[in-house]
């Protein structure tokens, strides 16, 4: 099985302050997220981490934490906080992918990057875009994308219960997009659905973001 996650931020104490993560200490967070990954991703599965595996940790300490994850095949699409995982001492931690990584799995094109894109390869032909970086929480961002016909999804752990998302779960999610629109208007929270409930949800989300 293939899995995706992003922005675990192992070792980053301040991430507890600017996200809604439910732990009191960074050690509790590290342990819980490792347990969440191991609870879903099997040893022989494949896991894509779309950036920011760790922050404020030495490469050696981050590598030691990586070894606690049972999955053997982990790909890292680099984010803005990642180490140089190609240096010899830690080169075995991940398969390091390019900043924009394009997969084709069972006919489905998937564009991976750390940063969200407004335009991605094949977006007019049903390709998915998976990303991280923005630390969206509670699923609101992903739901707004789906309601507006965008095949774009934040796989970051803050948006997904601090756990990876499987390819099958994403396939089911995107099946809920009735008519992919093939374009993005900036900013992403512009409501084009005509649905008043979506408008109320967007207004509430904007207020929340303004307060944070």
Describe each region flagged by the PLM.
Residues 1-7, 152-155:
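Short, hydrophobic/glycine-enriched beta-strand segments
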Residues 3-5, 10-104:
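Core catalytic region of metal-dependent phosphoesterases/phosphodiesterases
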Residues 91-198:
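Conserved beta-sheet core of the metallophosphoesterase superfamily
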